[in-house]
């Protein structure tokens, strides 16, 4: 199943993965027993358990711009600007490849970090997004799903 999911995503199937789904897409996961287990392999890197909550609480996400000078390379789910999205993180795991598609900022703080992987058909990261607060993200994802469905006919 891992290989089939990875092949479908690499072939262009839209994927929106938050938290545990993001972890599943990594190459490896270090279990509570200290052993590394193979995962889907869509996202290079490894996830592992930390001794305490990591990046806990409410955040605001803003899509990073200027990753490339070509607009299509900065587009996520076909959009060059998905706007600002409230979200939260609540996890004991961390990744050596959290992504750089968005910048997370803590409210009333100067603390922030880059996070999430984004491409024309993928959005994946630890943050849990609040879709009602920014419907552009689920709308863009659903549009990509419909486009993919048409290509499969």
Q: What would you call each of these model-derived segments?
A:
Residues 48-153:
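Amide-donor transfer/coupling interface in amidating biosynthetic enzymes
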């Amino acid at each position: 199943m891992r290989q089939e999911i990875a092949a479908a995503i690499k072939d262009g199937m839209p994927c929106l993965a938050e938290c545990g789904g993001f972890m599943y897409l990594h190459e490896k996961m270090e279990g509570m027993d200290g052993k590394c287990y193979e995962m889907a392999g869509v996202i290079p890197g490894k996830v592992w358990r930390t001794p305490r909550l990591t990046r806990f609480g409410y955040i605001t996400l803003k899509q990073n711009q200027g990753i490339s000078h070509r607009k299509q390379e900065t587009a996520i789910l076909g959009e060059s600007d998905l706007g600002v999205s409230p979200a939260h993180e609540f996890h004991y795991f961390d990744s050596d490849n959290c992504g750089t598609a968005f910048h997370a900022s803590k409210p009333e703080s100067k603390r922030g970090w880059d996070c999430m992987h984004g491409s024309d058909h993928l959005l994946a990261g630890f943050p849990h997004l609040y879709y009602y607060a920014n419907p552009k993200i689920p709308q863009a994802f659903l549009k990509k799903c419909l486009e993919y469905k048409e290509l499969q006919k």
